[in-house]
Amino acid sequence: MAMAEPLCVACIGMGWWSDVLADAVKRSGKLKIVACYTRSEEKRQVFAKKYGCRAAPSYEAVLTDAEVEAIINTTPNDVHLATTRMAAEAGKHIFLDKPIANSVSDGRKITECCKQAGVVLAMGYQRRRESHFRWIKRQIDAGVFGKLVNAEANISRDRLR
């Protein structure tokens, strides 16, 4: 699939983060939102009106839409594998919001199905370049913590401000 500019995308999964990404798409000028889908008819219509795109009646309609070259997937994490696999099999490139999946196994399946389909899979891990993450990576690489076998982190922030 040849990609032209602007790249025509469909947004799937409507929530506050889909609006944040859609606003960024509009500012970029490199992408154009042409369709959207979420299970809620009301949310679809509101999003379509706000961003000037078509409200698709089903996810399958998005995937068979020849104008749609890629999807922005902000669906719940537990359906990332199913929604991404369907998009890849339809030849659509994918921007997938983090985390890739709820399990390593599903994450591997997602990357494999995109690889097999020959589509681009882009992940929305926006924090990896922040200074405190680079600092902790240097500490890990320097062996400060010994042999690292597991790590867990929680980032909390006040979204109401």
Predicted regions and their residues:
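A broad helix-preferring feature
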Residues: 13-21, 63-71, 117-119
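Beta-loop-alpha module in the N-terminal Rossmann-like domain of NAD(P)-dependent dehydrogenases
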Residues: 53-113
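N-terminal Rossmann-like dinucleotide-binding module
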Residues: 1-51
